[in-house]
């Protein structure tokens, strides 16, 4: 029995190691500002940078602006617009031609509701976010895969994507401590494909309240079935927020 358990454990470790070699590693960093206009109503701005390909390549830049309203003590609504400038990796077409990497703009809108409940020092929250992303059409350079000679530009058709992102999160309030650890799981459902799961994210992180106006966020994230504008696999993240 012990031998069987050992072999089963060894198989799991080998499988995980092989999978880890296939996964990418990305770095996500962000800087944001939040302002309370009046009671229960906030506005926010955020800029973000993401890398991919084992941290060696720029993945995307983005900027967002949003508003949030606290409906009750346990329910909050928010909406935002995000402009994404995505670095599309090079690819080979079905005919063997080469399309070098190119920058691609995307427009994203979302509306979300977040409900929370506290139990002792734990706080559990459920966030449901409807998200729509539109990729405008554009023409990109294309070259012959054999001799590298220029070909007629490739036309990339515009495309929209509707998803529902469901995130369950737990935070823990440590007595007399400026650090707040959290863990979450998020599922992304494709609304254009009968709710099929497009992506799963697992996150472990900690929020660090430096002062009344300054805060940091550090986290590790793993995701599978990632879409094209995000690293598939492991992500290390850091964010800074200024509240005034």
Placement of each model-derived feature along the sequence:
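Start-of-domain marker
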Residues: 21-87
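Outer-membrane beta-barrel translocator/channel fold
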Residues: 52-54, 58-60, 70, 74-136, ...
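Repeated loop/turn-to-beta-strand initiation elements of outer-membrane beta-barrel proteins
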Residues: 40-45, 74-79, 120-124, 176-180, ...
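Residues on the lipid-exposed face of transmembrane beta-strands in outer-membrane beta-barrel proteins
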Residues: 31-35, 65-69, 111-115, 128-130, ...
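Outer-membrane beta-barrel transmembrane domain signature
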Residues: 123, 127-215, 223
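Flexible, solvent-exposed coil segments and beta strand-coil junctions
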Residues: 42-48, 84-95, 144-151, 181-185, ...
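Residues that define the transmembrane beta-barrel architecture of outer-membrane proteins
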Residues: 25-27, 59-61, 105-109, 158-164, ...
